[in-house]
Amino acid sequence: MGSCSGRCALVVLCAFQLVAALERQVFDFLGYQWAPILANFVHIIIVILGLFGTIQYRLRYVMVYTLWAAVWVTWNVFIICFYLEVGGLLKDSELLTFSLSRHRSWWRERWPGCLHEEVPAVGLGAPHGQALVSGAGCALEPSYVEALHSCLQILIALLGFVCGCQVVSVFTEEEDSFDFIGGFDPFPLYHVNEKPSSLLSKQVYLPA
């Protein structure tokens, strides 16, 4: 019962996490945020592996997903610090775009209710560096929107880490119990096949 509930919870969580990651990937593509795009791509692949491992009882896949959940929390903490300019980080820097674009964030450039101003790019040969659109006077700061997205990702990743640890523990116990009763052990089969041959040899050498 515990195995089923833990697996079902992790399957539902992975499915929701996959939807949230795809939504975030779309907006990062629209904002040309190349570092988050790469991170989201890796995240989506590992979430799919975790989902597959949970359904198919693949312990290693679930372990990889669980370890990645901790890494994903760290990455999203960095994103929060970046957009809130904590620890000397600047949200106007080109750290997330690899200096390939002057765009900063789709939410910053297209957030409803903001006043936008197009700034021409100077000395940039990148195809996506034609203009930088900055927002001002927003009801909700776009940086907070990015931070809230990361907070949601952290919450899901923490739940995934807990559920992943539980599923790994259950899978490990099931493997240990299976090995204890002789699973994948050819030794008992050898003894079963050995007894008829020994009995047959005894019958052959019995005196008439």
From Swiss-Prot:
GO aspect biological process, one term: regulation of sodium ion transport
Compartmental location: Cell membrane
UniProt superkingdom: Eukaryota
Swiss-Prot/TrEMBL keywords: Cell membrane, Membrane, Transmembrane, Transmembrane helix
Membrane topology designation: Multi-pass membrane protein
Complexes and interactors: Interacts with ATP1B1.
Family named by the database record: Belongs to the NKAIN family.
Name of the protein this chain belongs to: Sodium/potassium-transporting ATPase subunit beta-1-interacting protein 4
Organism field: Homo sapiens (Human)
